């Protein structure tokens, strides 16, 4: 579907304007969040996996669960019915729940209900007339996958000589410098203790989440990893 917005409008967070179908607000600070799960391992050994796409407010606060009437279930069926089976196939490889926490479907339902329903540009009133129910969620999942494909965190780290290891330790600044050399912006790194397990890539948006232009920006704050002694552990098939 097309939003009809184009990509020449104002960048999100550039003004205090109210949210519209073509200007994302108040959640104009957008995070593409990725997991690195090693215990239990999820996803390919040479790729991070998708956590979600979150609309933070420009000051770093955020809203959640913005429209319970659109808490869709059966995301697989929704995607398949609306011609997005390629997106679904990719999600089944790269957007995976921790098996201890539930099914992939449950993670997708949670990410849409908790975060997806909060985008001003994904309100049902923004959809082309005659759009099927859930079309805005399909557009959300398609965009998350599209954006994730532009953020090959594993490849970027290994390009800079940083590889998963159970013994090597890194400083926060060395990891972010390596990623900045590849991506041009600095992400936020989160850890479980001192083990790197999540990364946040930040954007402002011009236009709609459906088909707008995501402009990468550096993280406005650091993640919770320590300043040194960080390990990027390998995925060891510890299932």
Curated annotation (Swiss-Prot):
InterPro entries: Ribonuclease_T2_eukaryotic, RNase_T2-like, RNase_T2-like_sf, RNase_T2_His_AS_1, RNase_T2_His_AS_2. The lineage of its organism: Eukaryota, Fungi, Dikarya, Basidiomycota, Agaricomycotina. One of its GO terms (molecular function) is RNA binding. It comes from Lentinula edodes. PANTHER family: RIBONUCLEASE T2. It catalyses: a ribonucleotidyl-ribonucleotide-RNA + H2O = a 3'-end 3'-phospho-ribonucleotide-RNA + a 5'-end dephospho-ribonucleoside-RNA + H(+). This is Ribonuclease Le2. This is a base non-specific and adenylic acid preferential ribonuclease. Disulfide bonds join 5-22, 13-58, 21-126, 66-118, 191-225. GO terms for cellular component: extracellular region. Keywords: Disulfide bond, Endonuclease, Hydrolase, Lyase, Nuclease. Gene3D superfamilies: Ribonuclease T2-like. It is an enzyme of class 4 (lyase).
